Amino acid sequence: MNDKYFSRVELEELLEDFCLKASSEGFSGIVSIVGGAAMLLAYESSRAQTTDIDALYPHNKALEKVIFNISEERGIQKNWINGAVEEFVPYGVENAWVHYKDIYGITVRVASAELLLAMKLAAGRPRKDFPD
């Protein structure tokens, strides 16, 4: 399956679905979003779409099942939300997160503009990240 590109509206729908199903599994924590999805959701950006939601969230069987089920229901890539970026998120950065919204008892926050810039610079991908 080719990766699907998601617009801002589609990202909001995916987050709504994820939070509804995750809360029904007893999850009530925090989901922290970085990368292109954070830029689409919270900032004025020339970016119109992204292929995934790079996020920090607890990895457990219940949430992984929710993610898998949503991918099956919607016919999208299985890694539509993933934590692959976790090792690249610097910890201890002051004001690193901005509250986005609360959805079904789950706090969704996005990386601050400063954190996004720091991560883009650290990634060292000028061709890919320059438009951002």
Please report, for each region that a protein language model flagged, where it lies by residue.
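Compositionally biased terminal segments of proteins
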Residues: M1-D132
